[in-house]
Design a protein with these regions (language model features):
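Hydrophobic/aromatic-rich alpha-helical bundle segments in the mid-to-C-terminal region
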Residues: 4-5, 124, 146-195, 206-219
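Helix-turn-helix
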Residues: 15, 19, 23-57, 61-62
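Short coil/turn segments at alpha/beta junctions that flank glycine-rich nucleotide-binding fingerprints
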Residues: 26-30, 104, 148
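Short, basic, alpha-helical segments at the C-terminal edge of helix-turn-helix-like DNA-binding modules
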Residues: 64-70
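Short acidic/histidine-centered micro-motifs embedded in hydrophobic/aromatic stretches
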Residues: 65, 110-114, 129, 163, ...
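Amphipathic alpha-helical packing segments from all-alpha helical-bundle domains
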Residues: 71-75, 99-103, 121-148, 158-159, ...
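Hydrophobic alpha-helical connector segments
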Residues: 75-106, 157-164, 209, 216-219
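Helix-loop "lid/cap" segments that line or gate small-molecule binding pockets
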Residues: 95-102, 110-117, 198-203
């Protein structure tokens, strides 16, 4: 039997992972058998084991690929945030996170499967140390905001930015995956504006808020 090329192996593994993902999302990890995956991928059960020793190895490979994509997407998003604490940038963050949720719904469904069936073993690093990560990314911007007197007394900018990030994520996850159907009784546009205002008014000093209000009126 001729040896498969690396490209042929990659194609075959992609087919297997696509089949597995379909089953995992539809019926969960533990309810899916290797036989189910082999049948949908149109490979023999024995051949399937040539590519993956276990079902969890398939699950982990799917998640690793998604995490790489998500990491790249989030880096692109953060690169577009000039001033992380200003209203226009917070709203832009919300818009881009909404697009991310809508474009990659399979990823979030697999995350919930991981929470239910593996106690979030495979996705834990996505949230572990999140505030510290944002502090590293935006350290200079946060410090500049402090020095300008833009922040309310006692506000920790990295913590607030993390809270805003998670709130935008949660809003779109509820709408996309849980049938929220305007669960805040607002359209997406109105929800983005409302969440932005909640955090902006909680973060910014009175002087900075007055500056933004003045620019909004003049604009």
């Amino acid at each position: 039997m001729p040896k498969l090329s690396n490209n042929a192996i990659k194609i075959r593994k992609t087919t297997i992972e696509d089949a597995a993902r379909e089953h995992f999302i539809k019926q969960g990890f533990h309810a899916t058998s290797m036989r189910d995956i082999a049948k949908t991928a149109e490979v023999s059960l024995g051949n399937l084991y040539n590519y993956y020793a276990t079902k969890e190895a398939i699950f982990e490979s799917i998640i690793d690929s998604y995490l790489t994509v998500m990491d790249d997407k989030l880096r692109e998003i953060f690169a577009q945030i000039d001033e992380p604490l200003e209203p226009s940038n917070l709203r832009k963050l919300g818009e881009m996170l909404g697009e991310l949720v809508n474009q990659h719904s399979d990823f979030w469904l697999l995350m919930y499967i991981d929470v239910l069936e593996f106690q979030n073993r495979h996705f834990r690093n996505m949230f572990d140390g999140l505030t510290d990560r944002f502090q590293r990314v935006f350290a200079d911007k946060f410090e500049e905001a402090r020095l300008r007197g833009d922040l309310r007394t006692g506000v920790e900018p990295a913590s607030v930015f993390t809270a805003a990030y998670m709130q935008f994520f949660n809003y779109f996850l509820v709408e996309k995956l849980f049938g929220g159907n305007q669960h805040l009784n607002l359209t997406d546009e109105q929800a983005l504006n409302s969440i932005t205002k909640i955090f902006a008014y909680g973060i910014l000093s009175e002087a900075k808020l007055a500056e933004f209000k003045k620019s909004a009126i003049n604009g």
